[in-house]
């Protein structure tokens, strides 16, 4: 792979850093100091050829000691494009009224004269010069060292009509043109769709899809630190501290109570000591204390429904058993926090549901216990069975009919020739007796007719019951 080309810094930046160290490349110093071959050619050529202020040479482009000689007189001329505008009020209608003209610029002398009281306010020209036609409006400004302005004092009636005078012809109306160049990167061309449902010319551009290449970031799934206890969690209440915290073991003795009625009747029990019991002493009747509103009793006497540190909710109440007391009502003794927690509501058990609908491509597996079924595995590709056959009696029959030929065993009859023909009787037996001597001939059985011997193989097999197709069982209807 070719080495990657690293872009070099700017020539002027290199010149600032490497000039003092003397480590500049050979092409940096001549380019900055103007000592290249092209600069030298211009320097030597400018000695004999004057190029003026064109800025071609390496000079500053300033004029010589004598300066430049202007081709025109002093001042400047500005030309504006215009076109004739027809309209306005004809000058013939202003003969009796007069015309309002601006002040006349005159060279009256070195001093500036003030407003003359005898000067007329309106000057009526004898003849208005009419321009025969100009292609443009020429505005010239003459520069002079001293300019004197003369102002006219108005005279005559106060009601003077001031009209805008416009010649009938050859009026100059200036035009201002503005050109706007839209940026195609931010503003698409407006096109009309010629085909139905064509959206290629729409201005709305939707950019979608996935990015190409590797992403610089990493997708990390957010994890909740604590799940809400309710569907609409509220702002957690700040737990009280010190003596206001009923669950504090420093200020209260925690007493778990199983019966909530004991919390309601806390403080109403009176214990009598039989040693100091007296008939004259009658205990004061205690009022029935029930669960009341917290606003009607003090903060300690009211039973509250609080959530403990473990999160369980229960009834809580602060009580003080009978102890020492003063006449001012101050009682001395420990404080007990009676607490009766409710039973915990466990989350329901998760029961795996069985799908009621089976798709067509769902594979149903049926478990079959492994046991001996009494069937033998038969190889379907084998010609003969490997199982031993039981001996059975069979007979061989030829021909179209089935004829049984019984063989009668008689004593003294030796091996002979048995001939059976289709023209003879079925039960006829012919025996040739050779006198009791053994015959050297092989017994021959002759059967009339054409015998066609053919070899045919037949395969008879039965499928194992486990290979038979089973109907799919459905759980519901």
UniProtKB/Swiss-Prot annotation:
GO CC terms, sorted: host cell; host cell endosome; host cell Golgi apparatus; host cell nucleus; viral capsid
PTM text: Highly phosphorylated.
Molecular-function annotations in GO: DNA binding; structural molecule activity
Alphabetical UniProt keywords: Capsid protein, Cytoplasmic inwards viral transport, Disulfide bond, DNA-binding, Host endosome, Host Golgi apparatus, Host nucleus, Host-virus interaction, Late protein, Microtubular inwards viral transport, Phosphoprotein, Viral penetration into host nucleus, Virion, Virus entry into host cell
Protein name in the entry: Minor capsid protein L2
Subcellular location: Virion; Host nucleus; Host early endosome; Host Golgi apparatus
InterPro entries: Late_L2
Pfam hit, one: Late_protein_L2
BP GO terms, sorted: microtubule-dependent intracellular transport of viral material towards nucleus; symbiont entry into host cell; viral penetration into host nucleus
Positions of disulphide bridges: 18-24
Keyword DNA-binding listed: yes
Family: Belongs to the papillomaviridae L2 protein family.
Job of this protein: Minor protein of the capsid that localizes along the inner surface of the virion, within the central cavities beneath the L1 pentamers. Plays a role in capsid stabilization through interaction with the major capsid protein L1. Once the virion enters the host cell, L2 escorts the genomic DNA into the nucleus by promoting escape from the endosomal compartments and traffic through the host Golgi network.
Subunit structure: Interacts with major capsid protein L1. Interacts with E2; this interaction inhibits E2 transcriptional activity but not the DNA replication function E2. Interacts with host GADD45GIP1. Interacts with host HSPA8; this interaction is required for L2 nuclear translocation. Interacts with host importins KPNB2 and KPNB3. Forms a complex with importin alpha2-beta1 heterodimers via interaction with the importin alpha2 adapter. Interacts with host DYNLT1; this interaction is essential for virus intracellular transport during entry.
Motif Nuclear localization signal boundaries: 1-9, 469-476
């Amino acid at each position: 792979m070719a080495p990657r080309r690293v872009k070099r810094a700017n020539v002027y930046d290199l010149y600032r850093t490497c000039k003092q160290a003397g480590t500049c490349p050979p092409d940096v110093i001549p380019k900055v100091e103007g000592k290249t071959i092209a600069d030298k050619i211009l320097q030597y050529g400018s000695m004999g050829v004057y190029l003026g202020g064109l800025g071609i040479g390496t000079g500053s482009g300033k004029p010589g000691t004598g300066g430049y000689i202007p081709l025109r007189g002093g001042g400047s001329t500005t030309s504006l494009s215009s076109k004739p505008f027809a309209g306005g009020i004809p000058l013939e209608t202003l003969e009796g009224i007069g015309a309002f003209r601006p002040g006349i610029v005159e060279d009256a002398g070195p001093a500036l004269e003030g407003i003359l009281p005898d000067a007329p306010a309106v000057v009526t020209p004898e003849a208005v010069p009419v321009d025969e036609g100009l292609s443009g409006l020429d505005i010239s400004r003459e520069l002079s060292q001293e300019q004197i302005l003369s102002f006219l004092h108005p005279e005559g009636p106060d009601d003077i009509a001031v009209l805008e005078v416009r010649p009938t012809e050859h009026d100059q109306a200036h035009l201002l043109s503005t050109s706007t160049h839209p940026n195609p990167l931010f503003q698409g061309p407006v096109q009309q769709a010629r085909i139905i449902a064509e959206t290629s010319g729409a201005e709305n551009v939707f950019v979608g899809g996935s990015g190409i290449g590797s992403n610089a970031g990493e997708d990390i799934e957010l994890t909740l630190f604590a799940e809400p206890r309710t569907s609409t969690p509220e702002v957690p209440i700040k737990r009280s501290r010190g003596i206001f915290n009923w669950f504090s073991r420093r200020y209260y003795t925690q007493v778990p109570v199983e019966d909530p009625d004991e919390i309601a009747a806390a403080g109403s029990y009176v214990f009598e000591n039989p040693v100091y019991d007296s008939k004259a002493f009658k205990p004061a009747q205690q009022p029935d204390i029930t669960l009341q509103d917290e606003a009607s009793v003090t903060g300690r006497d009211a039973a509250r429904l609080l959530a403990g540190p473990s999160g369980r909710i229960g009834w809580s109440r602060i009580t003080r058993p009978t102890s020492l007391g003063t006449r001012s009502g101050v009682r001395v003794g420990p404080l007990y926090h009676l607490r009766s927690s409710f039973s915990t509501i466990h989350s329901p058990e998760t029961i795996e549901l069985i799908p009621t609908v089976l798709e067509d491509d769902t594979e149903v597996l049926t478990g079959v216990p492994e046991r001996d079924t009494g069937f033998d595995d038969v190889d379907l590709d084998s010609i003969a069975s490997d199982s031993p056959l039981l001996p059975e009696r069979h007979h061989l029959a030829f021909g179209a009919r089935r004829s049984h030929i019984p063989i009668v065993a008689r004593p003294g009859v030796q091996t002979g020739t048995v001939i059976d023909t289709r023209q003879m009787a079925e039960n006829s037996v012919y025996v040739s007796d050779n006198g009791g001597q053994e015959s050297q001939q092989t017994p021959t059985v002759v059967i009339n007719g054409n015998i066609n011997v053919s070899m045919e193989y037949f395969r008879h097999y039965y499928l194992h019951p486990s290979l038979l197709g089973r109907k799919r069982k459905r759980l519901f209807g």
